[in-house]
Amino acid sequence: MKRTLIVATTSYAGMGPYVSEIVNTFSPEDDVYFLLYDYEDNFFQINIKNELKSHCTFYKKANSSWNKLKSMLLGDKEFSNLVLELCRIKSIRVVHYICDPAPCSTAKILENKGIRVVGTVHDLEAHEAKKAPHKMLRAWISEKQRRKNTNYGKVLVTNGKAQYEKLLSMYPNKELYYHSFPSLVTLEIEKGTEYPPELANLDKPYILFFGRIEEYKGISYLYEAFVNTPLLNEYYYLVIAGKGEIGFERNKN
């Protein structure tokens, strides 16, 4: 295996568990290094296993509106420069951006140095969303940049079979790979003994949706199916937990 740098550009929403689960499959003996973009909650610092910390570089920047705007319009040059510096210091031969394909400008510099650049594609199409106008504008600009980077990327990986087929039809001349989605159910979750106060004394099992609450995820269909299926609602509770707004009427009983 060629010496590899895995780059995670965000721990936002589901990306935090996704990245940490992948990183934690490695051991210190593997010839792999990690550059992880953290926020105020120090998600990666907390969730990456200690024996890998010597292989990790944690990049931290406040998740402020100003930093978001600056990064959206100008890119994060400091972060890109850190990628290049780590490649030089560690003699990296492969860089894998696992949250999105690499920015075109960074990918070109790396390729000119003989470094293979791999990008994971998560969303070929932008998610449906209903947000404030300024957030919709930001999402549109981000999507435009993401599409540009995907179009440029020479080696792409995806965790979705349908998306892999679509990539094959869109980019017949690219190097494309499918890899099954890593489980986000960690050992800590499986063996956990702590309960939120709201769930500690329930009198029957529950079906849990946990994650950011957004319209495109079809939570309204999940709720409708649950309330209209006696086999479910008589023997289970439905628990919807996460940040966001539930955009449909519901029976709060």
Question: At which residue positions do the language-model features occur?
Answer:
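An aromatic- and histidine-rich active-site surface loop
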Residues: 76-81, 94-121, 125-126
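Membrane-proximal helix-turn-helix segments that form the acceptor-binding/catalytic region
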Residues: 84-86, 105, 112, 136-156
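Donor nucleotide-sugar binding/catalytic pocket of nucleotide-sugar-dependent glycosyltransferases
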Residues: 151-191
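A short, glycine/small-residue-rich beta-strand->loop->alpha-helix junction that serves as a flexible
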Residues: 6-21, 40-42, 100, 214-217
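Glycosyltransferase donor-sugar binding loop
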Residues: 37-42, 183, 210, 237-250
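N-terminal strand-loop element at the rim of the active site
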Residues: 8-13, 25-74, 163-168, 178, ...
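Conserved donor-binding/catalytic core segment of Leloir-type glycosyltransferases
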Residues: 198-217, 223-226, 238
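Short donor-sugar binding/catalytic loops of nucleotide-sugar-dependent glycosyltransferases
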Residues: 10-11, 210-214, 229, 244-245
